[in-house]
Swiss-Prot record:
Protein family: Belongs to the herpesviridae EBNA-3 family.
Annotated Basic and acidic residues bias: 396-405
Species of provenance: Epstein-Barr virus (strain AG876) (HHV-4)
Protein's cellular compartments: Host nucleus matrix
Keywords: Host nucleus, Host-virus interaction, Transcription, Transcription regulation
Main location: host cell
Family annotation (InterPro entries): EBNA-3/4/6 (IPR007706)
Subunit note: Interacts with human UCKL1. Interacts with host CTPB1; this interaction seems important for EBNA3-mediated transcriptional repression. Interacts with host RBPJ. Interacts with host USP12 and WDR48; these interactions form a deubiquitination-competent complex.
One Pfam family linked to the record: EBV-NA3
The protein, known as: Epstein-Barr nuclear antigen 3
One Gene Ontology cellular component: host cell nuclear matrix
Amino acid sequence: MDKDRPGLPAPDDNIEEVPSTSGVQERASEGDWENVLIEISDSSSEEEAEDAHLEPSQRGKKRKRVDDDAGGSAPAQHVPPPQLDHPGREAILYRFPLDLRRFIQAIGAAATHPDTRAIDQFFGSQISNTDLYVMYAMAIRQAIRDRRRNPASRRSQVKWRMTTLAAGWPMGYQAYSSWMYSYTDPQVTATIIHLQATLGCASGRRCHVTFSAGTFRPPRCSPGDRQWLYVQSRVGDLVQSSNPCYSIFFDYMAIHRSLTKIWDEVVTPDQRVTFMEFLGFLQRTELVYIKSFVSYALGTTSIETPWMDENPSTETAQAWNAGLLRGRAYGQDLLRTEGEHGEGATCETREESEDTESDGDDEELPRVVSRDGTKHRRPPIFLRRLHRLLLMRAGKGKERARETLAKAPRRTYGTPRPPVQKPRPEVPQSYETATSHGSAQVPEPPPTHPLHQQHSMAPCMVAQNPRAPLGDQLPGVPKDGRGACAPVPALAGPIVRPWESSLLQSPGRAFAPVSPQPMPVEPVPVPTVALERPVCPAPPEIAMQGPGEPSGIKRTRERWRPAPWTPNPPRSPSQMSVRDRLARLRAEAQARQASVEVQPTQLTQVSPQQPMERPLEPEQQMFPGSPFSQVADVARESGVPAMQPQYFDLPLTQPISQGAPAAPLRASMGPVPPVPATQPQYFDIPLTEPINQGASAAHFLPQQPMEGPLVPERWMFQGATLSQSVRPGVAQSQYFDLPLTQPINHGAPAAHFLHQPPMEGPWVPEQWMFQGAPPSQGTDVVQHQLDDLGYPLHDLNHPGVPVSPAVNQYHFSQAAFGLPIDEDESGERSDTSEPYEALDLSIHGRPCPQAPEWPVQGEGGQDATEVLDLSIHGRPRPRTPEWPVQGESGQNVTDHEPRRVVVSAIVHMCQDDEFPDLQDPPDEA
């Protein structure tokens, strides 16, 4: 176990260690990023270095392959990997500085090495982006190579023991970031690419061994390197779109760098005609990046074929010359077609030849359908709800389900669907009602008064879309040639809907009562079932009497009974039946006539005809569940006539003085007559904060101007001392008890109090005094320490958690949040934590009081009392990556500032039977 653990941190951390990566070693000075050197060694030295790190028990034990054909007697000859011709280490070290093109060539050479061949299993030709290829290759390559070596002594390894909090990915990981310039056209500004390589292991095990490898840090690109990367990108796009028989020649040219060597040693006899076509394309191409690629690979732009003169055979030379001419003639189009691999080969493809063979057979050949093909329609599980219902109703038979699915209309995805016409149910003739909301089952209507019975009246359906006016929907009015219903007595006078009475009034005027003409029928008491009463118990109404009554306030209580259950109640007056509408109109007419004849002198009830003041929202915010504004809304929207005055019991414990009536009563019931001061009346409303003259609470909105000055004693909360005399303009000091751990300054009010318009009289700072704080003589800011307070502090349940909204500073520590503390292997805690910053919760520059130091034990038995700064004004913005903006031509928009792109790669090191050489050595007991 001790061998797998990292050593102590290095004393000098300025020199960052980058482990060797199979022949590629990066040396970067701190000030010069352009001159970076490379060391390339042959594969023999690499194998010797690996054997040196193997354990003694593993040395000298190499498995030998047995030839099956020879019966196990003769071992098979091991074919070594192809060796690349590179000059000596000293020549490359002093003659060739590391540029990105040689760096990528080293990666290509590493792919042929036995130990680094696993790179091909992670990615192949799918990545045409050069910088992504570099990042992925070097991250995986270093992880494979460095897991066999001793862990480097780096201080950052202490922080590498991390585990994600996600339940679905129990991985240990370490991310390392760097940046480089991207490849681009010379006319476009270079883009900065942020590279991030993340190394991880399963379940966070053996993290020190897995994370002991360094991370690839690419060198900064020079202008020549960016030009070369641009060429490689364009050539890579061409290779991806070319036929595989031609695209392999691009790799041969980039690796071997000689046409003669490719012709003699690499290309097979069957590929020579195709290779000649490829050379013909290179001779006549006009693409600039293809010419640059040939120049980088061969060192010249001329394409020569010296092997043509060495072969005197006439037939072979003619075939090669014909292929060269075809490449010149077709150009780039030749790379996208199927090549001719022989002299007598035809131009038809494999698919065409298979079609010609199948045409000769009369019998139909079996066809195998692949599941990976293009889906022309969605699977049955993704069918629409209508189709699924049809399939479910079809029964268990598969044939019936298929027939039902075939009959279902097929539409492409995204096309609008026509509205589904619902079948209109048949209304039985026995019922004399007709509703506009057709239902499948019409229950028996409740018993009604004989006056409401309409004899010999045919069913009259009311139009639902669009909704016609109420006058057009009444029976006896023919429309569009439809049969008229039986004649009924017409109403005299205009028809006024109660829910539209408020719309007829101007916004600045009060409601004008509408009194229709009396109906030519005998007044019959209308039962309550004919009215549209709310199902839930409606809130009570408030009524006050004038000063002439013998008793101050008359209190009564009415119990609201829920309306009897009616099947499928109408949603709006236009959807009611004709009988219910007629009964409702008669009841409303009688109610209005009764209210016009008997007009009270004082305010006795709340009705839609009474003027109501706005806004009603403040009362709802001040008193949760307050019924003041709901009464007017219910009376106005539902159109229920006010038959009798409604009262309810409201205990009052505070006087409503002559100068300022109660805000909720005034907002919902209009003007209130003055109340004599000799008979004080009280009401009790639970409040949690005082509303003083200096600053009103945030949830009290400005009301309409009230008669007389505002007296602070009227808004005293429960438990406060009441003033014996009511004097306008005099405000007394008010105190309340809250468990606070920090005083509030006199010079700055609390944060949750909003600014109000100036009021009469100077603002007294003593209005915001708290218990235990001595009053000040002036308006200066006074600081009070906790030691001077006479009451004990509140016991904190958890350090760092405020106990009152008045506390405007918070204190956090590592122990308060339960953060994990890194410990090294010796059991001592590593002092890698940075000091905490101060959190400033001040608003608009107001002074922040000194925070008390809560005794929070930190590391080493010391108190962690640093204050965290939470202010958002004037703080430096964190560095956030910016995404590049592409113009209309598809290229990046040119800016003076370089753009940034975040590129992240996650490399998961798998330790299983597939990579036995990657597994860690067994732990020693």
